[in-house]
From Swiss-Prot:
Pfam families assigned to the protein according to its UniProt record, in alphabetical order: FAD_binding_4, MurB_C
Task performed by this protein: Cell wall formation.
Active site residues of this protein: R163, S233 (proton donor), E329
GO process terms (BP): cell division; cell wall organization; peptidoglycan biosynthetic process; regulation of cell shape
Protein name according to UniProt: UDP-N-acetylenolpyruvoylglucosamine reductase
GO cellular component, one term: cytosol
InterPro entries registered for this protein in UniProt: FAD-bd_PCMH, FAD-bd_PCMH-like_sf, FAD-bd_PCMH_sub1, FAD-bd_PCMH_sub2, MurB, MurB_C, MurB_C_sf, Oxid_FAD_bind_N
Keywords: Cell cycle, Cell division, Cell shape, Cell wall biogenesis/degradation, Cytoplasm, FAD, Flavoprotein, NADP, Oxidoreductase, Peptidoglycan synthesis
PANTHER family in alphabetical order: UDP-N-ACETYLENOLPYRUVOYLGLUCOSAMINE REDUCTASE (PTHR21071:SF4)
EC number: 1.3.1.98
Requisite cofactors: FAD
An annotated Gene Ontology molecular function: UDP-N-acetylmuramate dehydrogenase activity
High-level lineage: Bacteria, Pseudomonadati, Pseudomonadota, Gammaproteobacteria, Vibrionales
Catalyzed reactions per annotation: UDP-N-acetyl-alpha-D-muramate + NADP(+) = UDP-N-acetyl-3-O-(1-carboxyvinyl)-alpha-D-glucosamine + NADPH + H(+)
Length: 346
């Protein structure tokens, strides 16, 4: 456990917006986490566990303890059919994906270059290019803060949904993810039907080819947080009913849409925003990225309020034009707890 002297949060979330915490502590084990939660100095203070802070906007100074999860380690077992990986929550996600490719354990390559740590991947049920975490997650190990016990949730118990899981709801305040288990099948089948990956030859493509293609695509479309502060996709792709989809298609026949179920369809939030001519739109130091409308960026001097006002402008514009209400994928953190766009701007 390491207590950091610096309490600025700018370097610990990818938006890079200046805000302060009461305390910043690195935890490298379950014992470290328990020590922090049971320390009388911090016991009554709000606490927030962070990995890379890649899906978060601090809307205010945080009045409590920000705990940086640095639990590391990768353990591999195998069966005749699969590799079974047990991974510490503090491992860098892209570094882990790269590790699996280097060790000839494909299956995660479509999820390359997603920022964040392994422990945050189940919270959002991260996904990209036709693959979601739930497709390869076997279990999630969680620490019960009150009892100090570590238990294991099966994939089903994680209640995965679109950018959603039980960790955003019932377990949000009571448990901490400490490790994630993955099952990677030895008989690898490439997932190349989504977007530009369809150009790859499915019969000859190797996992490293998919990995490299995904990295190229993401680097060409998404800004580097080291250059322009951002949290990746700011909004969820909205899911609508078939009747609403049909009505919109009548008016906008070129509108991308993807079938989710017999009754629901997913729209591309980036396309909706782009149709509102919002690329390059700027409020203060916050801006809609000029290449990818789904991303809001910190041009260098943005405040949290700049980002919030810009996000609300985008939501209003899309709702006015399409009658579709965008939800933010990025988590908003207030002074003591998580909040929402509507709450923070009320």
């Amino acid at each position: 456990m390491r207590i950091l002297q610096e309490t600025s949060l700018a370097a610990f979330h990818t938006f890079g917006i200046e805000s302060q915490a009461y305390a910043l502590i690195e935890a490298e084990s379950v014992d470290d986490l328990l020590l922090i939660w049971r320390d009388k100095q911090y016991q009554t203070l709000p606490k927030l566990v962070l990995g890379k802070g890649s899906n978060l906007l601090f809307c205010d100074d945080f009045s409590g303890v920000v705990v940086l999860n640095r639990i590391k380690g990768i353990t591999v077992n195998e069966t005749q059919e699969s590799y079974l990986l047990h991974v510490g929550a503090g491992e860098d996600w892209h570094g882990f994906v790269q590790w699996t490719i280097e060790h000839n354990m494909p299956g995660l390559e479509n999820l390359a270059l997603i920022p964040g740590c392994v422990g945050s991947s189940p919270i959002q049920n991260i996904g990209a290019y036709g693959v979601e975490l739930q497709d390869i997650c076997q279990y999630v190990d969680i620490l019960n803060i009150d009892s100090g016990e570590v238990s294991r949730l099966s994939r089903k118990e994680c209640q995965f949904g679109y950018r959603d899981s039980v960790f955003k709801h019932e377990l949000k305040e009571t448990h901490i993810i400490v490790a994630v288990g993955f099952t990677l099948k030895k008989e690898w089948e490439p997932k190349t039907t989504y977007g530009p990956l369809a150009e790859l030859n499915k019969t000859t493509v190797a996992a490293i080819d998919v990995f490299n293609a995904v990295c190229r695509i993401r680097q060409s479309k998404l800004p580097d947080p080291q250059v322009l502060g951002n949290a990746g996709s700011f909004f969820k792709n909205p899911v609508i009913t078939q009747s609403i989809k049909d009505a919109l298609l009548y008016q906008y026949p070129q509108m991308p849409n993807y079938k989710v179920s017999n009754l629901e369809y997913k729209l591309a939030a980036g396309w909706l925003i782009d149709q509102c001519d919002l690329k390059g739109m700027q409020i203060g130091g916050a801006k809609v990225h000029e290449q990818q409308a789904l991303v809001l960026v910190n041009t260098g001097n943005a405040t949290a309020r700049d980002v919030l006002l810009l996000a609300q402008h985008v939501v209003n514009a899309v709702n006015d034009k399409f009658g579709v209400l965008l939800e933010h994928e990025v988590r908003f953190m207030g002074a003591s707890k998580e909040t929402t766009l509507s709450e923070v701007l009320a």
